[in-house]
Amino acid sequence: MAGFNIKHWFADGAFRTIIRNSAWLGSSNVVSALLGLLALSCAGKGMTPAMFGVLVIVQSYAKSISDFIKFQTWQLVVQYGTPALTNNNPQQFRNVVSFSFSLDIVSGAVAIVGGIALLPFLSHSLGLDDQSFWLAALYCTLIPSMASSTPTGILRAVDRFDLIAVQQATKPFLRAAGSVVAWYFDFGFAGFVIAWYVSNLVGGTMYWWFAARELRRRNIHNAFKLNLFESARYIKGAWSFVWSTNIAHSIWSARNSCSTVLVGIVLGPAAAGLFKIAMTFFDAAGTPAGLLGKSFYPEVMRLDPRTTRPWLLGVKSGLLAGGIGILVALAVLIVGKPLISLVFGVKYLEAYDLI
């Protein structure tokens, strides 16, 4: 059948674009994963399991607050901005970006206030002493950059996945480099917090710089303007879309960063550290689907929904993601235990049982 002919599948230009963009993201993800393991390895070897767990909890706490509060503004930009660009309507694209940018700013402000305000009530349960409490409060100032996804949406809408790949490789490189320095010079907990903080700050700033540069190249000016309610008037269904994606992402976040924080509260920092290592390996199996999904969304928005092309594109992408995901999962099961022992040491081998 033609639907199962490999050559016929790859004759689809949209499918080839998805694979190309996924390859960009995949290459950076492989680099990011290796550098991320290096950063975690240095932290695990440079501190006791308990303090390693505290570091993981601090990072997960800030991310969980961000995940609960933030809107998936990158989806908004792709959903409404991509058709505007396709139809050569820069003013509508400007409205979409302005609305998305305003949501990021408002939600980021709410998140940072909420994150710092909640911290004193949770500090004892999270295993924070006086020094680590203030470092955790400092880390919470990163929440607005974690909550902002407008620049990611812009880069996807203008098909600059190469720039996304550069950013996704740069941030873990800086984190790994800082972690190596903190481990080598025995800077301890404070050194690792500062290294991770700086890498996140620089990585988040890069996204905004890349996005602003692409907007200037396309003569789209004054898009990064606080204009929440006025710009929303020109985007039909914008509010219902952002609320539905926000709720869906909040539910998703409960399984990820929030679960690490809960493990820390219930079982202690050392258990949270083991859980983080296990989740790092476990999530590798879902990475292919995530990468293809991020590439699929902009392409499907360019297709006519009245035809069968979007559906066929979804089936092809899903089958490809599932096949690669199964192979990655098998690899994790086979090499996971010796890899954990090699990278983190035998004191963290219990993490494999959690996988």
UniProtKB/Swiss-Prot annotation:
Main location: membrane
Matches recorded under InterPro entries: Poly_Biosynth_Transport, Polysacc_synth
Periplasmic side, ranges: 1-37, 122-134, 199-261, 345-355
Compartments where located: Cell inner membrane
Keywords: Cell inner membrane, Cell membrane, Membrane, Transmembrane, Transmembrane helix
GO CC terms in record: plasma membrane
Cytoplasmic side stretches: 59-100, 156-177, 283-323
PANTHER family linked: INNER MEMBRANE PROTEIN YGHQ, PST FAMILY PREDICTED COLANIC ACID TRANSPORTER
Identification of the protein by name: Inner membrane protein YghQ
Source organism: Escherichia coli (strain K12)
Taxonomic placement: Bacteria, Pseudomonadati, Pseudomonadota, Gammaproteobacteria, Enterobacterales
Gene: yghQ
